[in-house]
Amino acid sequence: MTMENNMIPHEVVSRIVDGALPVEAWREHLNLSQEEVAKRMGISHSDYAQQETVAKPRKATREKIAAAFGIKGDQLEL
């Protein structure tokens, strides 16, 4: 699923309100496993899992994760 604009789906916002970090909320919304995202990014599963624990990833990291999700980097900024 690719987001053509900067909209953030209600399901993602709801998960964030419930306490999930944006990266995790988006991954779950897109029905991706941590392993799949790690493969798309070319990193290990453990390295990706660590990224989901960072409240505000660096811009370069955010852009890489967004590319793996098929969204824009600023959609991970909430």
PLM feature segments, named:
Residues 42-57:
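Recognition helix of helix-turn-helix/homeodomain-like DNA-binding domains
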